[in-house]
Amino acid sequence: MTNYGADLLWVLIFASLGFSAFAVFVSISRQRRSRPPTVAHIAGEDVAAEAARKVIREFEKNGQSADAALVTWSPETLRKILADDLPGAQVIVVSNREPYIHNSKNDDVELLVPASGLVSALEPITRACGGTWIAYGGGTADRLMVDDNDRVQVPPGNPSYTLRRVWLTEEEYQSYYLGFANEGLWPLCHIAFTRPIFRASDWEAYQAVNRKFADTVVAEARNERPIVLVQDYHFALLPRMIRERLPEAIVITFWHIPWPNSEVYSICPWRERILEGLLGSSIIGFHTQFHANNFTESVDRFLESRIERADAAISYGGQTTLVHAYPISIEWPADLLAKLPDADDCRARLRNRFGLKADVKLAVGVERLDYTKGILDRFHALDELFKRYPEWIGKLVFLQIAAPSRGTLPAYKLLHDECHRYAEELNQRYGSEGYKPVIMVAEHHSQEQVYEIYRAADICMVTSLHDGMNLVAKEFVTARDDEQGVLMLSTFAGASRELLEALIVNPYDAAMMSEALLQALNMTPDEQRERMRPMRQMVRDNNVYRWAGSMLLDAARLRKRGDLDRVTGAGDRPPSIDNVVSMFERKRVALS
């Protein structure tokens, strides 16, 4: 009875860890009862049992401490997860774009923080976690600011992590970044009806640059078990390259753009190679479950693999990869809000800058000049509004901030010309002395300037033709601590799954968008507040620290499972999905 009582306790412990752990217990129990209890065997079993108990206690202790911490998601939460659940782990972030750029200006060095959704999401995370951020050094003074190992400590004045710059030749940059990544993968993954262009020379450069970044990751790793956060479509081959050289690393790849359905994906000449590269990841994250499902379907169609849809796991080449949705977000509260004037002052400053009358309604759009963002479709909607409701002519101005982007590529040159031409047409058709309905500003703006624009706007238009998430929508909501303003949001942006109180529109339907514009223009302050308040609460509760914390907790569970498997001998078996996902009960922490 004593043995069975102890076994019952073990059942409960292992069941809490998942089915595969329970299977390990059953196997050990059967072996124990099938042979005589010799002294030597009992001693060895006690040692193994005690080792298993130690790992389980650590596993449970860490899980409980993390659960207790996850009430408010903040930098402190992330640091606690790292300290309690991933002690000693080195965090390495890899992205194409760097968080700080040094440029030469008038015999001096100017520091720039790029207005990038990826940077605005990841920079506060890296500040909180420390570690190393590896990125392409493209600033004209970047080489002047690094040490002999191509490193610079950032942020300036209060450094908390290392920026490791990787140098690319002009040919590498043109072919890897502008070529394969942005003429090939970018249009392939976005339903914007721009034809992808694939060249063998671009593919060769893409492979070479991914290898260069893999070399840098290995060089920067302080041990064999770093946590590597690979960012976006520039590095589809990198996870497999890291896995081959650092097999014990936890590689978390986050794909920031949509993943197409398998029929569209089949266009890519190197489709199998890209999937194989990504499946070197321990975890692959997407903004939405829809895109995660598309990825899984692509793997199912093009690779011989084992897929467990219930567990969201793919087994390929002796390794299991978990595929999940992690909706990205932004920092809350945004540090820069404390530095900004209130909404009324921002309105006055912006209207003074552009010579707008006090009673004119202001709609804004803020993004890179990109064919996926639906800028021309906003112009169509404005045209339709003025045709249907001419009384709004002279009473509404649309300000489009369109940061120059990839301007050497033909598709972007064409978009630039079309946008400026259409804006001028609208101004000629509906403008008058002292009034232009469209103001097009093709300049880079700092994050502070962008937030001032958000606070000054009556309406923010986010009308992407296709977007993984779109953080402009969340930034606008965050900026509006006055709980005023109306968000118009494309149904084809991932953010529309979360910001449900926005006016959700189809950017291809100009008539629908014009009616939504009219609704926004006539919306009362009370209704604006009723819509803005829950959206702000959603961003607050689901901020970028929760996004990162969810992935780090999942990484911790994977690492603990690996440690447990090694102790119990499960690690000696061929890798299988059961070894990995059975313990992976998605987010047992209270996330509400």
Predicted regions and their residues:
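Short, strongly hydrophobic alpha-helical membrane anchors
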Residues: M1-A6
